[in-house]
Amino acid sequence: MSRFKSDFLRTLDERGFIHQISDEAGLDELFAKETVTAYIGYDPTASSLHVGHLTQIMMLHWMQKTGHQPISLMGGGTGMVGDPSFKEEARKLMTIDMIEDNITSLKHVFANYLDYDRAENPALMINNADWLRGLNYLEFLRDVGRHFSVNRMLSFDSVKTRLDREQSLSFLEFNYMILQAYDFVELNQRTGCRLQMGGSDQWGNIINGIDLGHRMGTPQLYALTSPLLTTSSGAKMGKSASGAVWLNKDLLPVYDFWQYWRNTEDADVVRFAKLFTTLPMDEIARIATLGGSEINEAKKILATEVTAILHGRAAAEEAAETARKTFEEGALAENLPSIEVPTSELDAGVGVLSLIVRAGLASSNGEARRHVQGGAVKINEQGVSDERQIIGTGEVTGDGVIKLSVGKKKHVLVRPA
């Protein structure tokens, strides 16, 4: 029996999204009796988000699905300052044009999880630059700044960590906490927003906004955070051996995204199915009973369902079929990731280590060399034992490609161009 009566909090609870709530009973009552507006903030520091952001995105997804209104708040204003939370050094400052380009790109990612066009409870994307860029500094200090205690701000873990390490914390970054708190108050005044959600590392910042709202006369505001997500082996979500796992197919092919989830550790399959898919809980309970070799089927279901939300069902099933042909039939699948190498270079010959790095299967020649020495590298299914081997047009198959493999699960087609 769930401790919550509202559909939204009950869904988050049974799927493992909840770490901390500022007023559990009060927030549950609010969700049970009215349509609630809530937001999560994102600083547009890149043109795409990665899988480390998926927990919060899915919280917004479930909010809309249970009849409430989610806001994805773009930090067009705060992004010009940079969040100092648990960072070892100041972030590189971005121009307005860079930030706006990133926001445009991010909306395409969010649109796969949220519906901005529906008639009832449409999702909103709001840019805090709309109010932050026009602030009068003296009025802001007088009306907002006076509510903040520097002593208290210095006690926050995110600040203390920097200061304890004797790392510089600029006045610019220090202001970030005030601006983020003000966002909550401004959103309440503009949209009636009552809840801010985020990762557990944002708890202090969110409580700041609640306190500011109380001092400035808003209705009761609430905080809800999700746990810091790591794999069962302790690895942080969002990165793979080959780099960030982006939510933008221009940065990461659909097949690679699918494969990332297919490689989930056994102990994480059920937890990730709850968090990152919309599978019914009874279907997830069935998956939880799978063991032994059946766990691989569960991983394929997980990979296909997560990929279908982001890239569409057809693309997800195509990726699954590509994997099946590659691994189960040993066939050459045209939908494998590919790179182009000028024919002139192949005529002259390309070193295998260089080719591995260019294909994104290793980050350096040293890593590529270790793959060769470990017997993990194959060209057209033939093992490579010599790190000095030269790859040329002679290796191009009748299909017009060279299949480069590292291990059993990483394959790239090299196409002469």
Swiss-Prot record:
Q: Which PROSITE patterns match?
A: S4 (PS50889)
Q: Which domain of life is it from?
A: Bacteria
Gene3D superfamilies, alphabetically? HUPs, RNA-binding S4 domain, Tyrosyl-Transfer RNA Synthetase
Q: Where is the major localization of this protein?
A: cytoplasm
Matches recorded under Pfam families: SYY_C-terminal, tRNA-synt_1b
Spell out the protein name for this chain.
Tyrosine--tRNA ligase
GO cellular component terms listed in the entry, alphabetical order:
cytosol
Top enzyme category:
ligase
Per UniProt, L-tyrosine binds at Y39, Y176, Q180
Query: What GO terms are given for molecular function?
Result: ATP binding; RNA binding; tyrosine-tRNA ligase activity
Q: Does the keyword RNA-binding apply?
A: yes
Q: Which organism is it from?
A: Agrobacterium fabrum (strain C58 / ATCC 33970)
User: What job does the chain carry out?
Assistant: Catalyzes the attachment of tyrosine to tRNA(Tyr) in a two-step reaction: tyrosine is first activated by ATP to form Tyr-AMP and then transferred to the acceptor end of tRNA(Tyr).
The UniProt family comment states: Belongs to the class-I aminoacyl-tRNA synthetase family. TyrS type 1 subfamily.
Query: Which residues take part in binding ATP?
Result: K239
Cite the InterPro entries for this sequence: aa-tRNA-synth_Ic, Rossmann-like_a/b/a_fold, S4_RNA-bd_sf, SYY-like_C, Tyr-tRNA-ligase, Tyr-tRNA-ligase_bac-type, Tyr-tRNA-ligase_bac_1
S4 RNA-binding domain mapped to chain residues:
350-416
